[in-house]
Amino acid sequence: FSLAETKFQVIYVGDDKKDLNDSSIVLKLTYGNTTYLLTGDATNKVEKQILDKNLKSDVLKVGHHGSQYSTHAQFLKAVSPKYAVIQVGKDNSYGHPKDVTVKKLESIGAKIYRTDKDGTIILSSDGENISFETVKTDTNG
C-alpha cells in the first residue's frame, strides 16, 4: 500500500503462536530512492523464510534488539544496509545487542545507531538522501 509518496510492502506476517518474536510483521518502506527494512523482533527463522524477497535496503532496523538469534550472514548480505538501527534499552538484562551481531554489522560497513548509546534516533529523508539526528537523555547514555 502507499501513503502519499511512501510505499509500504508487507514482507512477512508472523503467525507463530509459540514464539511471539517470530509473529512480528516485517515491513519494507520505500520513499523516493531510499529504502528501509523494519524487522520487529524477527529472528533467524523468519529471516531465512524471506530471503527470496527483495530485501535490499539502505536502513535496517535490526531484528530482536540485536540478539544473537537475528541478523544472520545470508540475511545481511541480502539486505546490504548502509545504516543499521538497534532499538535496545541501556544496561538491559539480556545483554543486547550481542557483540557478535554488532561485529557482523561492522564487517559489512554499516553505520550503526543504537538507542542505548545514541538516545533517540531521528531519520530524515528527501527521497534521495538520509540523515540521522540523535538526542541523548538521562536514561540512554
Outline where the language-model segments fall.
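Cap/insert and terminal regions of metallo-dependent hydrolase folds
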Residues: 49-120
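Core dinuclear metal-dependent hydrolase active-site scaffold
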Residues: 1-59, 117-141
